[in-house]
Amino acid sequence: MSEPHKTDVLLVGAGIMSATLSALLRLVEPNWSMTLVERLDGAAAESSDPWNNAGTGHSALCELNYTPARPDGSIDITKAVSVNEQFQVSRQFWTYAVENGVLPDVRSFLNPIPHVSFVTGADNVQYLRRRYDALVTNPLFATMEYIDDSDEFARRLPLMAEKRDFSNPVGLNWTQDGTDVDFGSLSRQLLGFGAKHGMTTLFGHEVVNLTQGSDGTWTVKIANRRTGQKRTINAKFVFVGAGGGALPLLQKAGIKEAKGFGGFPVGGQWLRTGNQDLTARHQAKVYGLPPLGAPPMSVPHLDTRVINEKSWLLFGPFAGWSPKFLKQGKVTDLPFSVRPDNLVSMLGVGLTEMGLLKYLIGQLLLSESARVENLRDFAPSARDSDWELDIAGQRVQVIRKAKGKGGVLEFGTTVLAAADGSIAGLLGASPGASTAVPAMFDVMKRCFSDRYPSWEPKLKEMVPSLGTALSDEPKLFEEVWAHGTAVLKLDKPASSIPATTADESTAGTEHSPAAATV
């Protein structure tokens, strides 16, 4: 075996998290050596692929699970404000990156699409009105509209209005300033910036082991997945941004911070169409209420997507199940992740999360026609022949130890970092990609605590609101929002997005990384 390749920073996984961290570190430490290892042959081919996620600029504008009703009927907006604040940090960094040549093609990853909450039934419409009243006084949500008029509904959402019985009340919370994000294109542009500035990229290579030496550095053994050839990398800092593959690698590293954590994989499926008549009549990301007792991941939504400059509609998600932690993972991922330190946590979840298990079983039993019937709650005129099933990505929900329960399932993202700051990783899913920038700021602050103060002036140049809650600073919010809107071209509609043609859509097929390039 050849001499170890030495690097200051090793990034494992070529998705949005590693891509974001690589760009941030390159901007504050231009002389550091960096190496990226990715097991697949292309960047952003797992959860960051646009076909593997909803592409919502996840800012809590339309996701109703972030605004629960309290027992007295009032609306708790705490989580919605927190998620939106995080998205604002990402949006400001993207603005800086576009201005400074880090992201050369803004329209390929970001498009203006309204974000809409949708409910039916008198009680739900009343809830939506209370939600609007609670949110609209916050500067971050000030442009939200409340709509319960059927004519206005039909004007804005003609596809959803067709054949709808408006004797059943309808309600919308409409925010014009939403976005559709292609996190695959965004990841590739960020990684391209890193590669242009000296980052070594090793695609088709997999981490097989990692151990920490007495000097605090990490010896990481990797293998070429095509040839089997092995090589060694010596890294001062390791970031594991491997999506569902992060937990097994952090377990291999043996850091105590990962002990007790488990993962529960949940697959996803979408109905999709590229029918030009349908895409022309639905230009919004519309989120509804989850079925009673269903987990947050089950929130149904009918989305406009812009992928490779083509317009699509997606509806879902429908849950699938596989023991794989990655879409292109191994069936042994789940069983091999069970360790003595997390066995109690994982068994505890199996006993306490009966609602999730019931939901998954119900989803797995759905027929094709039953899925389209669910779609008709949103688009009553939907025809089976217009829609096809597409397999989305795997998400691994975090299982954490909990006193008295064994373990609890968490719906969110968790940064794990070793006490010495030499290794960190990201676990979990939603809100995920949209909060990549604040998540990576957290990694930088925790793992480079000695350097972070010297980075802050540069980071504040990238994100003017850093350390400030924009909801408490309406003037600053107006300034950064207006500037970002102009730089990111969000004041210009995604004009003349061509619809897909029949031969560009193949029913029942998964999109390979090469084909979808994300």
From Swiss-Prot:
Its EC number is 1.1.5.4. The keyword Oxidoreductase applies. One of its GO terms (biological process) is tricarboxylic acid cycle. Residues 497-509 have a biased composition (Polar residues). Its cofactor is FAD. It catalyses: (S)-malate + a quinone = a quinol + oxaloacetate. Gene3D superfamilies: FAD/NAD(P)-binding domain (3.50.50.60). InterPro entries: FAD/NAD-bd_sf, MQO. Pathway: Carbohydrate metabolism; tricarboxylic acid cycle; oxaloacetate from (S)-malate (quinone route): step 1/1. One of its GO terms (molecular function) is L-malate dehydrogenase (quinone) activity. Residues 497-518 are annotated as: Disordered. Keywords: FAD, Flavoprotein, Oxidoreductase, Tricarboxylic acid cycle. Belongs to the MQO family. PANTHER family: L-2-HYDROXYGLUTARATE DEHYDROGENASE, MITOCHONDRIAL. This is Probable malate:quinone oxidoreductase.
